[in-house]
A protein has these predicted regions:
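P-type ATPase nucleotide-binding
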Residues: 59-190, 200, 212-222, 227
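Conserved S/T- and glycine-rich ATP-binding loop of Class I adenylate-forming
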Residues: 1, 46, 185, 333
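Conserved ATP-binding TGD loop and adjacent catalytic N/P-domain core of P-type ATPases
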Residues: 25, 37, 117-119, 152, ...
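Hydrophobic "anchor" residues
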Residues: 47-48, 164, 335
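Membrane-embedded transport module
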Residues: 272, 277-350
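Conserved phosphate-coupling serine/threonine residues in phosphotransfer and NTP-handling enzymes
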Residues: 7, 196-198, 333
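Re-entrant/interfacial helical elements at transmembrane boundaries that shape
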Residues: 6-16, 54-57, 87-94, 270-271, ...
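Conserved catalytic phosphorylation-site environment of P-type ATPases
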Residues: 2-76, 231-232, 250
Length: 350
């Protein structure tokens, strides 16, 4: 009986402690496997930054005003679910700009969007996306992009009928707890990696702020999956932390996927093994310690129950235990297992 109680009781207590701290484990396996994590891969938007980008710069080309550029981007991004698109829409609405309806809306995941607005063919996305669509970026636009990237800003280019008409830059705020989280993971002999769809310079800027040395930028969703698989081929257990639709495949591929629960997309939460309901990234080191403590409790309980059973059988063979005392010893073993699991309650794991 004690042997059968060892694992489920410890898992139940571990799940309870996780829920108490805003961590939801979908399976017992995810609770057990998190402690084995050797590499934590993080997306930038959400885990490292607050995930609420704001428009900071509007750089129109010659012959177009800032309001006109913003109206074009507003019409395109109105149907977008991307955080950058939502930020542009919110900014335009605050200025009470009129919304022109778009048609033939198409989204290329991780790159950009296209649509027809008032008979014009509009594109909105990163530099690579516009170039793939046959739009050339002028020297002035390239210079503006370089300057914005060095400031850690994400840049969205807008094109009309094959001609780039300007750049809209957005900036996100670094999570104050991100740097401390990376430091704690490093102290636990756990490496951190940044996987992001942002350009290399923007990614390097934020990675330097939190102390992440290994950075992979300009990634599409399938590229993130490839990077996770490559990290796993080093015979490492990889934990992926993300919040967006683009992170879902990587969350599913990783040994353990952790989604930002309240701010994350439904698809990301569904794909993940664990959800951070409070979006508190500082819980990641706690998550690993809780997993390790739970597994240690399971091993200790199994060892203790086996020793008690072996001792009881030996004493019974020697005639030192009668059926009544044997039953008491058997039940005592079950009580010990429950008490050991209860020691997990209210532990800080600091």
């Amino acid at each position: 009986c004690a042997l059968g109680l060892a694992t489920p009781v410890a898992i139940m207590v571990g799940n309870g402690m996780g829920a108490k701290n805003g961590i939801m484990f979908k399976t017992a396996v995810s609770l057990e496997e998190t402690g084995k994590t050797e590499i934590v891969a993080l997306d930038k938007t959400g885990p490292i930054t607050n995930g609420t980008p704001k428009v900071t710069d509007i750089v129109p080309a010659d012959g177009i005003s800032q309001d006109e550029l913003l109206r074009l981007a507003f019409a395109l991004e109105a149907k977008s679910e991307h955080p950058l698109g939502k930020a542009i829409v919110a900014y335009a609405k605050n200025l009470d700009l009129p919304l022109n309806e778009s048609a033939a809306f198409q989204m290329t995941s991780g790159k950009g969007i296209s649509a027809e607005v008032d008979g014009y063919q509009l594109l909105c996305g990163n530099e690579k996306y516009l170039q793939e669509c046959g739009v050339s970026v002028t020297a002035n636009d390239a210079g503006a992009l370089e300057k914005l990237r060095l400031q850690g800003k994400a840049s969205i280019l807008v094109a009309v009928n094959g001609q780039c008409v300007g750049v809209i830059a957005l900036s996100d705020v670094l999570r104050p707890e991100a740097a401390a989280m990376v430091q704690k993971l490093t102290a636990m002999q756990t490496n951190t990696v940044l996987l992001t769809g942002d350009n290399q310079k923007t990614a390097d800027y934020f990675a330097a702020q939190v102390g992440i040395r290994e950075v992979y930028a300009d990634l599409l969703p399938e590229d993130k999956v490839g990077n996770i698989a490559a990290l796993q081929q080093r015979d490492r257990n990889v934990c992926m932390i993300g919040d967006g639709v683009n992170d879902a495949p990587a969350l599913k591929t990783a040994s353990v996927g952790v989604a930002m629960g309240s701010m994350g997309s439904d698809i990301a939460v569904e794909a993940a093994d664990i959800a951070l309901m409070s979006d508190d990234i500082s819980k990641i080191p706690y998550l690993k310690r809780l997993s390790n403590a739970t597994v240690k409790t399971i091993k200790l309980s199994i060892t203790l129950s086996m020793c008690i059973n072996f001792l009881a059988v030996t004493l019974s063979v020697l005639g030192l235990l009668n059926p009544t005392t044997g039953a008491l010893v058997h039940n005592a073993g079950s009580c010990f297992v429950v008490l050991i699991a209860a020691l997990l309650y209210d532990r800080k794991f600091e």
